[in-house]
């Protein structure tokens, strides 16, 4: 339990490190740059994507007719984990806000969105959920077709 809490603390620190670097800048606030605009756009798009994906999944799961089914409608028809794409976009947008502040060792703050991406796609989020889904629906040909035809994270916008 102690190691688990320490690992979670490290996880939180690495993820929020980009915010710490941005907020620790001294002096007057610099002029807004194109990086700030790009960061705001990416953050907003990621936030909206995550919220819409989570709401769609909640509404799907709240419908008794969908009990025991996987969601393959709305954003979930384009990506098996659109909420995670939103999370990755959100943290990447925050990192873009910091581009003007990153100099020297502060550039290591870019580890934050990379860490979020690796964590969600290789360690905790996607692998765990995909394994559970295979355990639950792995014998269902329709699910296997959905899994084969629907990208994990980045949607295929043209079919």
Model-derived segments and spans:
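Short, small-residue-biased leader/transition segments that mark boundaries at the very start
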Residues: 2-3
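Extended, charge-rich helix/loop segments that form flexible
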Residues: 9
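Hydrophobic transmembrane alpha-helices
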Residues: 12-56, 61, 65-159
């Amino acid at each position: 339990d102690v190691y688990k809490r320490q690992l979670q603390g490290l996880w939180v620190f690495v993820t929020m490190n980009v915010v710490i670097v941005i907020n620790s800048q001294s002096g007057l606030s610099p002029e807004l740059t194109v990086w700030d605009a790009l960061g705001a756009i990416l953050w907003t798009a990621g936030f909206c994507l995550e919220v819409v994906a989570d709401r769609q999944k909640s509404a799907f799961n709240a419908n008794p007719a969908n009990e025991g089914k996987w969601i393959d409608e709305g954003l979930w028809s384009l990506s098996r984990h659109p909420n995670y794409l939103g999370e990755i976009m959100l943290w990447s947008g925050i990192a873009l806000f910091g581009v003007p502040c990153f100099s020297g060792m502060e550039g290591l703050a870019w580890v934050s969105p990379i860490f979020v991406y690796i964590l969600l796609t290789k360690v905790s989020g996607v692998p765990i959920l995909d394994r559970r889904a295979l355990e639950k629906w792995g014998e269902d040909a329709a699910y296997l077709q959905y899994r084969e035809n629907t990208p994990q994270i980045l949607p295929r916008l043209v079919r």
